[in-house]
UniProtKB/Swiss-Prot annotation:
Organism per entry: Klebsiella pneumoniae
Keywords of this entry: ATP-binding, Carbohydrate metabolism, Kinase, Nucleotide-binding, Transferase, Xylose metabolism
Annotated PANTHER family: SUGAR KINASE (PTHR43095), XYLULOSE KINASE (PTHR43095:SF6)
Taxonomy of the source species: Bacteria, Pseudomonadati, Pseudomonadota, Gammaproteobacteria, Enterobacterales
Designated name of the protein: Xylulose kinase
Catalytic activity of the protein: D-xylulose + ATP = D-xylulose 5-phosphate + ADP + H(+)
Gene: xylB
Amino acid sequence: MYIGIDLGTSGVKAILLNEQGEVVASHTEKLTVSRPHPLWSEQDPEQWWLATDTAMKALGAHDSLRHVKGLGIAGQMHGATLLDKSLQVLRPAILWNDGRCAEECQLLEDKVSASRQITGNLMMPGFTAPKLLWVQRHEAAVFSQVDKVLLPKDYLRLRMTGELASDMSDAAGTMWLDVARRDWSDEMLAACDLSRDAMPALFEGSDVTGQLRPEVAQAWNMPPALVVGGGGDNAAGAVGIGMADAGQAMLSLGTSGVYFAVSEGFLSKPESAVHSFCHACRGRWHLMSVMLSAASCLDWAAKLTGLASVPALIAAAQTADESAGPVWFLPYLSGERTPHNNPQAKGVFFGLTHQHGPAELARAVLEGVGYALADGMDVVHACAIKPEAITLIGGGRARYWRQMLADISGLQLDYRTGGDVGPALGAARLAHVAVHDEADRPGLLKPLPLEQAHRPDDRRVAHYAPQREIFARIFSKLKPLMS
């Protein structure tokens, strides 16, 4: 049996996987976020450990853990966990969604002119490196004591095994990794007055990084199981649904929208805010576009139009009057990441007349989210990635919307179920691979069951193509007014 642990922002999830790859038990412990100042977002690493300990004991109360062979860890990326020479935490961890260090991002790019080539990414406040520069500039007494910097999930690893280690996919989100070489960049570290000595050892996602310490194994009533590298949340989530090899891609419809495509080599397009990271699978990389408001636009629109729920919104969209004329919706309610990298981008309805009501607005929102998702997919494909299959995760029972997305993108989308387990499943699967031979990986990381293939309708593709062009022109014209 195998365990996967996912340290999320809102909770710690632990799952138990059997030899057939089936989830037999699961438990989640909630976490809270501290926001002591505007833009700040922090958590106490000790709370991570206490929640993990509680989740593991609850898992053991549901099913015996005495036959567990391996344990994998996934988690929220980019967080800065600062330790002193005694490996004690110096301050609350600064999280991925903390926005205090925009100025430090520019300073780092000025210091290292090749930073985008080295890291494959634009410097953004969410990443780890600018957080350390902020600490150096604003909390000098804390920075002077920093001996080690760990990512959130790797702090759990330290408590479990006593080892200082990370995996390639999570390390790629620090902006200290030379992503093409899969190694720390001395130049990027030096820009933060750090060196390799402050960094954990690097491993692939299915590499063994240590064993559970005897006292931890005893507390959890399990053997001293192997602990593997694991992965950052997006990479581990992709592994969980079988995205392990070049030519595979997934479109995830959550609060935000993420398009994740696997490659066999390092590719990048930082000028379009495409993320380029190492994958959690050996010898693989991935590109990722991020739309900040996807399903959250549907929640917002349901309230705006007075419809009872998102399903009601989607049902209303299907009754929209075709003769009323088109309405465009810019879905930038939280700014936008890919491809615009514009935190000032705003949501807009354009084209309203007396003929438009709630149903037409509902359809416009679904289409607008689709146009923005397709924009992100297009810039990823412009990096010379040609996915053989795109798995669609999320979207609930909204067959109408899923087909609309296929028609807007002009690409087949394979809707698969079972992806709701999340990154914990990928972490457990990586542990499963570690215990077996690497050659067995394809059989152990099979795709989830296919429920429906959404093939684009040529007539609807032709309808949406000019609508997408107008969508892009509306944003271009309004962009100067959004700052």
